[in-house]
């Protein structure tokens, strides 16, 4: 019997913070748990439209991810990105304390797995996909984050779903802080 219960409302809250019109996202699933029969899949549309598919995939051992930036609904490559929603930093190797003393603290903080964090700053509407990597690299340097997280089509873990990469207990990825810009 499966006792995991992904939290769609939590996922929805996160997506609504990223975009006032959360009707159009690109979701990605990847097999995580050993023995999972799930395969990588890309889904375009709303969380409501794909909730059942994402829940089933998560319960079957897949990690659930979302392309943070707005795409054209045709793919998940840099050329598919149409609008920057947020800048973010992956703090899997360091703590989050420096975030809270920053000149501009993040709008959203997510615990992706125990003691590992993602921080998001909502982007100005005029931010172009071409300048995205420069800001990402500066954030990674400033906060000792992962410098490889700099492509505009990057997917990040979707809060409300379970992280199952390690063969231990599943961990629900949770938004620990969220506020509008």
Locations of regions flagged by a protein language model:
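DNA replication initiation on ssDNA origins
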Residues: 1-86, 96
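Conserved aromatic
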Residues: 5, 44, 113, 123-126
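Short, glycine- and small/hydrophobic-rich beta-strand elements in well-ordered beta-sheets
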Residues: 17, 103-111
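DNA replication initiation modules
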Residues: 66-103, 123-181
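Short, conserved phosphate-binding/catalytic loop or strand-edge motifs used
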Residues: 109-118, 156
């Amino acid at each position: 019997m499966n006792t995991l219960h992904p939290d769609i409302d939590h996922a929805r809250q996160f997506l609504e913070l990223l975009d006032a019109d959360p009707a159009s996202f690109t979701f990605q699933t990847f097999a995580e748990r050993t023995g999972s029969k799930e395969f990588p899949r890309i889904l375009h549309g709303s969380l409501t439209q794909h909730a059942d598919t994402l829940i089933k995939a998560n319960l079957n051992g897949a990690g659930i991810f979302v392309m943070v930036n707005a795409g054209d609904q045709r793919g998940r490559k840099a050329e598919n990105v149409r609008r920057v929603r947020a800048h973010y930093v992956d703090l899997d190797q360091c703590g989050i304390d420096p975030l809270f003393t920053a000149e501009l603290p993040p709008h959203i903080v997510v615990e992706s797995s125990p003691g590992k964090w993602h921080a998001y700053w909502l982007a100005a509407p005029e931010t172009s996909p071409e300048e995205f990597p420069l800001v990402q690299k500066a954030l990674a340097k400033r906060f000792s984050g992962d410098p490889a997280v700099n492509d505009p089509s990057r997917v990040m873990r979707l809060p409300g779903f379970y992280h199952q990469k390690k063969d231990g207990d599943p961990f629900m990825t949770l938004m620990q802080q969220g506020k509008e810009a």
